């Protein structure tokens, strides 16, 4: 599988992409949310891990933009806000398939990715 990690924290991006690669996946990262749409045009991916709070363009706005062209692409919101119920509902309403706290370890984040991909695969395709 091919994953995209989008977070303005370069160290966290490097850590997550290295972890995903250690699991046998392709993984790329961007620190600037405004570059995601152009990146997706050239690089198909299976899922995105997307930070909610980024400069230039926040994750919630970015989800709305992604959903215009990539309605079925699994997106996991990644946030330092912890498990705030209101933030989780806002993320889901914006189009996120999952929500993960930055306080979790890489294995838990990986499990969340696999869950949303599993949910995505379970959704019947429109004819």
Q: Model features per residue range: what roles?
A:
Residues 10-28:
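Two-component/phosphorelay signaling modules centered on CheY-like receiver
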Residues 13, 55, 83:
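The feature encodes the CheY-like receiver
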Residues 29-47:
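Acidic, metal-coordinating helix/loop segments flanking the phosphotransfer/catalytic sites
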Residues 32, 58-61:
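Acidic catalytic/metal-coordinating carboxylates
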Residues 38, 60-71:
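Short amphipathic alpha-helix used as the core "switch/output" element in two-component signaling
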Residues 51:
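Active-site residues of response regulator receiver
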Residues 61, 82-98, 111:
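Alpha4 helix (beta4-alpha4-beta5 surface) of REC/receiver domains from two-component response regulators
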Residues 78-79:
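Hydrophobic/aromatic residues positioned on beta-strands within the core alpha/beta folds
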């Amino acid at each position: 599988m091919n994953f995209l990690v989008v977070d303005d924290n370069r160290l966290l991006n490097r850590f997550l992409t290295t972890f995903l690669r250690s699991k046998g996946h392709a993984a790329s990262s961007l620190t600037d949310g405004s570059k995601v749409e152009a990146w997706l045009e050239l690089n198909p991916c299976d899922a995105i891990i997307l930070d909610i709070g980024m400069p230039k363009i926040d994750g919630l706005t970015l989800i709305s933009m992604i959903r215009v062209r990539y309605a079925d692409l699994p997106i996991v919101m990644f946030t330092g806000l912890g498990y705030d119920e209101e933030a989780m509902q806002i993320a889901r309403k914006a189009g996120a398939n999952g929500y993960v706290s930055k306080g979790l370890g890489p294995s838990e984040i990986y499990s969340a990715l696999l869950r949303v991909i599993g949910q995505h695969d379970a959704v019947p395709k429109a004819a």
